[in-house]
Amino acid sequence: MRHCDALVDLHTGSFHRTNIPQLRADMTNEQVIQLVHGFGGMIVLHNPGARGSLRRAAAEAGVPTVTLEAGEPMRIQADVVEDGVERILTLMTNMGIYKRSYYWTDVAPVYLNSRWVRTDQGGLLISDVEVGDKIKPGDLLGKVVDPINNLEFPMHSPFEGQVIGMALNQVVMPGYAVYHIGIAATEKSLEIGPGDSSASGENGGAQPSDLREFD
């Protein structure tokens, strides 16, 4: 892969989950930052990638690489596919590979941190939010209903940010990761340097599997 100018790894959410179209990228790598700009306006989650992953190995070999995450697995979602095609064509246009008269340039957020909100209860998950929704601390995300006694256990957001991924309505067990929240960056958190993974969601109290398991 060392002969490549750049790589884009296309992903869906993991089983029983969905993602809003987004890029996973190491935003401390200047070459990767330039590649991200080529997509136009698109949500970006700063994350250097798991060791051994294609994205991280390629970047360490000097090939700028991002992961484009979108939609659900095992389904043909025409709107998600069309969105992904537009993003790739925009990148190709900006790289001079493909010619067309327009491309997207809307501003989109870069999230330097993210966390999964997990349920403490088992039962039937019923969500009140959708991917892409902006949230603040205390907002109701959804509830888990005990099918035996119909008791409802609400799930509230402890963070301010945006729902960038989430579990589909389903049967869940205690500890199940349900809502992936892109955390709104503060001015201080924007001051990251090369090799700093503390803003990627891999540290700071999150379980090691919180990001790696569902990338």
Where are these regions (language model features)?
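Structured catalytic-domain cores with a bias toward divalent-metal coordination
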Residues: 1-215
